[in-house]
């Protein structure tokens, strides 16, 4: 039997597990940064799937592990980062969590569950923060008044979902109805499926079922390339207007063959402000034996800002893929 393992490599705690820690250790990281990884079962020695993220927030930021019990009368979810509210439609599931310490959130115990697994075998890693471009923001801005965000993702998904697909469908419905308060990516899995959920703009989202023959490294980059069939409901779920909205607003982008390009439509273009993210992407590709070549694929650049936390970064010459196969 194959299993899916969430690996939350929390550098805040100094407990970097093999994949995430090694993927970023060779280059300096900046604050407010994460690096998300995925490794399909056909690429691992034990035939299992691994996923997770490094969380780089500050040198010392208290996290705690715990177990949220099942609640037969359901739960009411709310947030201190937005006006999001949601009430369970029935009993909730028991799940583990790795949360921010209550001292960081006005003594509330429910903030930022980040990673865990529930009694049904659904696991979650949340989140990888990304960003959207100005045209997407103008057309469909994030909704801080009601939108769901990192404060609640994992708690809602793990408390309410019996399968990974259920988690994707629930999160998608909440974004449809209430929006998101930040652009994020979340990985949701069970023993049968692993899904990557991406919040693209205020009410637009996409979720892709990940195959077992690919790897992925993403250090806070929202427009890493991928092709997806929006009509394939077995492997792709998304908001109803994911393509029609940008087409009507005039900012939709397409691949050379005419297929709608989700990542470039909503994501930001390559720029200096992402130089430290690209450093981590390059290091991750090297670690997973699919290296990029300096001079051909990227250049080392200096960060000359007065408040820079690292002196050098990198910029790629052209957009890179979200998914790849190791050498």
Annotate each predicted stretch with a short phrase.
Residues 15, 22-31:
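C-terminal segment of classical bacterial N-terminal signal peptides
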Residues 2-17:
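Bacterial N-terminal signal peptides that target proteins for export
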Residues 34-150, 170-312, 318-321:
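A contiguous strand-loop segment
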Residues 154-160:
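Short, well-ordered beta-strand elements within core beta-sheets of diverse protein domains
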